UniProtKB/Swiss-Prot annotation:
Residues 502-538, 635-685 are annotated as: Disordered. Pfam families: DUF4708. The gene is C18orf63. PANTHER family: GENE, 17266-RELATED, HYPOTHETICAL PROTEIN LOC100359752. It comes from the Eukaryota. Residues 518-538 have a biased composition (Polar residues). Residues 675-685 have a biased composition (Basic residues). This is Uncharacterized protein C18orf63.
Length: 685
């Protein structure tokens, strides 16, 4: 059964459609409605057999129009004009051939040219010109045509059918009536005598109702003899009706409900009492070869252009689809789908001691490197763990900016300040690593705001920074020549502690101003890695010396530093005290410019500072060092007690009123400039 219903595919190469044209023929309006359909079908078949280089087809759904496809030279030859004028029809202007028009014309032309070898019956083409009189099985094919711009696909299915001619008893007519009907030539079987009056009418196999059955042709019928019926069926469908053979012919009036009350006269051989019967077929290749042979002989070319047709058939296959999937309609899994998950950017905190990282001004250049690397897309969630160590330090700098409350504890001026500072730094070094999410959009926005808002401030700070940088460098170099190695080290340690204190106060400033100055510092002082190491060594030495840290604007630091230096070195003159006082005032002016203290690190060689620290550690003994530290701590406690309350109050007022207006900041800068000039005058004197 599967072999009988297997479809074979053949392909025909089409000529260039631009070389063809389609013409619409409109029939005359004078033709009666009862004859319009007959004239349409007759003209189509007659044009096909008159001219072998054209294709024709009735316009679908319109009874008075015909499509004709031809080559452009054939149309210019005006070969159809005489025939069209004979029937009083009109021919419209030619138009471009599209696949739909060509498909209709090919379907009709194939069936018309193949008859009577293959006769259209319903959706089948039954083989044999005597198929109407056959009582047994017959060969047939199902032909479907699909047309594209370049080729034609023919789907051919071979089958076996049985379509026997009807007998009167099949319509449930009584035997006595049938006997009387055969005996009398003028007898008529009326409708009430036909119990089963439904029938199938060729060639469409549509169903109709039998109204009556008779031998003589009615006077109202357009055909007056059996020969007229033969010519009519041959002209319209290519059917070859059975011969006369001297037998009395039987006719039927058929009523079609869709066509109204009008009845149509058919020979009994052109109707069937039952539908077509299908049977399985084994030798389908024989039918295919016979059909293709007739097709090539009847249609050797298309509109005068030769065609190329495949000789071997192609078949549909379902081998690529599994039976269980086909039955249950289970969709196969999609292995190419990717889950769209957005990875969050993280950064890891370092386990290194946070002493130098929290107190030093940190590398601004490294900080900008980290922000640029974070702003770029990463390949995974933990890609931040593979950054360099300097990038981790830069990230801790950004974290200290976001959490200024940690540094505010270091700035508390109390008696246990050194212990509190040491415990805070040690607790920070013991913190376990954490993953802190970094938001790219926020960093990009901060960088954009910094670049836009920092441009007017750069011009203002460039002049003051250049002057103060030159003055401060000369003061430090001159001071190093007069002071001893021990006092020189302590003096530089005080400067670095003041720089660290300025950095801690700088963290409480707005983030926008912080980023502005850091971007300036990156452009002016790119060598930040060397400064970090020097400051780290000095901070270690500073923690051993137990020097108290207070705010820069407190003069108690200056007094304690002077007393400490007088004890260490007796030949310290008032010139050095004046330089230290000027230095403290300079640091007060540069309170919001921590990068100037970074420039001090550039004037001093890092290797020289390391050698000095090592020599000092060798010269001073452990016992003497402890004795000096205890004396200094006792003396500084007595002097700092009345001033600690003032310092705390002033620090509180500074933290509360750090967002003051720009006018008050300018006044403070002017006052600091005047103090710095006075100290320089005393120094020169």
């Amino acid at each position: 059964m599967n072999d009988s219903r297997q479809q074979s595919l053949f392909f025909i190469t089409l000529p260039d459609l631009n070389k063809l044209c389609a013409v619409r023929i409109i029939l005359s309006n004078k033709v009666a409605d009862t004859e319009i359909r007959t004239i349409q079908m007759k003209m189509c078949r007659q044009l096909l057999f008159l001219h072998q280089d054209i294709l024709t087809s009735p316009v679908s759904g319109i009874l008075n129009q015909i499509w004709v496809v031809m080559a452009i030279p054939f149309y210019k030859a005006r070969k159809l004009n005489a025939y069209v004028e004979k029937y009083g029809a009109k021919m419209e202007a030619p138009q471009r051939v599209i696949p739909v028009i060509l498909q209709n014309c090919l379907s009709y032309s194939f069936m018309a040219r193949l008859a009577p070898a293959w006769n259209r019956t319903g959706h089948l083409l039954i083989q044999g010109r005597d198929f109407l009189s056959q009582m047994g099985k017959q060969s047939a094919v199902v032909l479907n045509i699909n047309v594209t711009e370049t080729q034609v696909c023919l789907s051919i299915e071979a089958c076996t059918i049985r379509l026997p001619a009807p007998e009167l008893k099949e319509f449930e007519i009584s035997q006595s009536i049938i006997k009387d009907f055969h005996a009398n030539k003028h007898a008529v079987i009326e409708r009430h005598s036909i119990l089963s009056n439904w029938c199938y009418v060729l060639p469409s196999m549509k169903m109709g109702q039998i109204i009556n059955i008779f031998h003589a042709i009615p006077a109202a019928c357009p055909f007056h003899s059996y020969g007229d019926f033969q010519r009519h069926w041959d002209a319209l469908y290519g059917y070859k009706l059975p011969g006369d053979c001297g037998k009395i012919k039987i006719y039927c009036n058929i009523y079609f409900k869709m066509l109204g009350e009008r009845t149509f006269t058919y020979p009994l051989s052109c109707i069937r009492s039952q539908p077509m019967q299908f049977f399985p077929r084994v030798d389908s290749e024989v039918v295919l070869k016979s059909f293709l042979s007739d097709l090539k002989s009847k249609l050797p070319h298309i509109c005068g252009f030769p065609i190329k047709m495949t000789s071997k058939p192609c078949y549909y296959t379902q081998e690529l689809t599994k039976p269980n999937i086909q039955e249950h309609k289970v969709k196969p899994p999609n292995l190419t789908t990717k889950k769209m998950l957005r990875a969050s950017l993280t950064q890891a905190t370092s386990r290194k001691p946070a002493c130098a990282q929290s107190l030093l001004p940190c590398s601004v250049a490294v900080d900008h490197k980290v922000e640029l690397s974070v702003s770029q897309p990463t390949s995974g969630i933990f890609s931040a763990l593979h950054l360099q160590p300097e990038s981790v330090q830069g990230r801790k700098k950004s974290l200290s900016i976001r959490a200024p409350q940690v540094h505010s504890e270091v700035l508390m001026p109390n008696r246990g300040n050194t212990q509190v500072q040491h415990t805070n730094l040690s607790s920070q070094s013991n913190i376990t690593p954490k993953f802190v999410p970094v938001f790219k959009n926020r960093l990009l926005q901060m960088n954009k705001n910094t670049s836009v808002l920092g441009s007017p401030k750069r011009k203002q700070h460039d002049v003051t920074q250049s002057k103060l940088f030159s003055l401060k460098t000369s003061m430090i170099q001159h001071d190093k020549l007069n002071l001893g190695p021990a006092i020189k080290n302590r003096y530089s340690s005080n400067i670095q502690m003041q720089a660290a204190n300025n950095l801690n106060q700088e963290n409480s400033r707005p983030l926008q101003e912080k980023n502005t100055e850091s971007s300036e510092n990156m452009t002016k002082f790119p060598s930040s890695r060397g400064k970090s190491t020097v400051s780290l060594n000095k901070n270690k030495q500073l923690s051993n010396s137990a020097v108290f840290v207070v705010s820069n604007n407190n003069l108690g630091v200056v007094k304690s530093a002077v007393d400490f230096q007088m004890k260490g070195k007796e030949n310290l003159t008032g010139k050095g005290i004046t330089q230290i006082l000027g230095k403290s005032h300079g640091s007060l002016k540069l309170k919001r410019q921590p990068h100037i203290f970074e420039s001090d690190g550039e004037t001093e060689d890092p290797r020289l500072l390391q050698q000095q620290s090592e020599n000092q550690a060798k010269e001073v003994g452990t016992s003497d060092h402890r004795l000096i530290v205890s004396k200094i701590a006792h003396r500084s406690k007595r002097k700092l007690c009345p001033e600690s309350s003032k310092t705390s109050k002033k620090h509180h007022s500074d933290t509360v009123h750090y967002g003051q207006s720009s006018s008050s900041k300018k006044q403070i800068l002017d006052s600091d400039k005047s103090k710095l000039k006075k100290s320089l005058i005393i120094h020169n004197a």
